[in-house]
């Protein structure tokens, strides 16, 4: 972190002393057999829109520059119970409203692969931290791509879980009917492991779902033979960079060569997807913000 953070700016808050103290405590629990899980003692970076008791939670905004919550987000509590060591809070677009992490009050995060490029957003700091190997994994939040897009930009793996899988309690909302917390890591296995840990029913979140199956690791397969993979033609047309299209089709060909069944198909009404998204998105925070103001 000390080597690359000045260039990447992944974090808005680093808790070096707290992390070292926590690591010592967790190590004792590992040694006496109290903690045995795969995340025990593993450092994690938390997106700065998730409440952490006693640690600044700013949403990368000057408005919340001194805000220290009195409670911790449920997903973060689940990680702590598993022995995770919190390194700090990661940079993001202010209040998650962006897709480049350039709107942060604390300065833009940079893409570790090319400092002239953006890491994506709004969870750009979390993805950059994992890509720069400042943290082995991180938590982000996704409303309309805020985990998936920066994960793609930074060459890491990110998952937006099905709505209701991970408690939103303690997540500072953007669009409550769309927000979801999810993992960011180097590969799918790590993400599945983290997702198993943060998944839980939480009565404090009215949209939380009691899932019958949370063994995501067992759902992973070693090959794609016989797997049907669809490619929507609508997304391969106007506005798509030719290099991106070429990369998508090359990946599809590789999957096909490995035994997958790849089929192109048409989606209807694609041109209305983004307008519909924004209608849903901004009707959610508008009444809340009007009430608070």
Located regions from the model:
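Gly/Ser-rich catalytic/binding loops embedded in alpha/beta enzyme cores
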Residues: 1-143, 250-253, 258
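Flexible, glycine/charged-enriched surface loops at secondary-structure junctions
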Residues: 10, 36-39, 203-209, 256-268
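Glycine-rich beta-alpha junction loops
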Residues: 48-50, 143-145, 198, 233-236, ...
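Short acidic, glycine/serine/threonine-rich loops at helix termini
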Residues: 57, 97-101, 148-153, 171, ...
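Charged, often glycine-rich, active-site loop that binds/positions anionic groups
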Residues: 107, 276-284
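Glycine/threonine-rich beta-strand-loop-alpha-helix active-site module
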Residues: 143-169
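A short helix-breaking turn/cap at a secondary-structure junction
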Residues: 160-247, 251
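Single conserved hydrophobic/aromatic residue that forms the stacking wall/gate
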Residues: 282-293
């Amino acid at each position: 972190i000390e080597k690359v953070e000045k260039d990447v700016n992944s974090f808005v808050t680093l808790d070096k002393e707290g992390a070292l103290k926590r690591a010592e405590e967790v190590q004792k629990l590992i040694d006496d057999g109290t903690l045995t899980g795969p995340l025990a003692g593993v450092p994690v970076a938390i997106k700065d829109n998730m409440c952490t008791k006693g640690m600044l939670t700013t949403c990368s905004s000057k408005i919340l520059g001194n805000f220290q919550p009195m409670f911790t987000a449920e997903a973060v509590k689940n990680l702590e119970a598993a022995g995770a060591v919190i390194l700090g809070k990661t940079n993001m677009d202010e209040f998650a409203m962006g897709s480049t992490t350039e709107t942060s009050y604390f300065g833009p995060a940079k893409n570790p692969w090319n400092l002239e490029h953006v890491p994506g957003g709004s969870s750009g700091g979390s993805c950059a931290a994992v890509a720069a190997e400042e943290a082995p994994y991180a938590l982000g939040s996704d409303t309309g791509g805020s985990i998936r897009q920066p994960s793609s930009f930074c060459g890491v793996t990110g998952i937006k879980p099905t709505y209701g899988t991970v408690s939103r309690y303690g997540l500072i909302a953007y669009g409550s009917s769309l927000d979801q917390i999810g993992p960011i890591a180097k590969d799918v296995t790590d993400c599945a492991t983290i997702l198993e840990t943060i998944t839980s029913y939480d009565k404090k979140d009215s949209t939380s779902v009691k899932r019958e199956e949370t063994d995501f690791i067992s759902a992973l397969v070693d090959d794609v033979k016989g797997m049907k993979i669809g490619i929507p033609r609508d997304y391969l047309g106007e506005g798509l960079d030719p290099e991106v299209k070429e990369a998508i089709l090359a990946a599809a060909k590789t999957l096909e060569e490995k035994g997958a069944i790849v089929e192109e198909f048409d989606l209807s009404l694609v041109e209305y997807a983004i307008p519909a998204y924004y209608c849903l998105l901004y009707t959610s925070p508008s009444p809340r913000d009007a009430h608070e103001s």
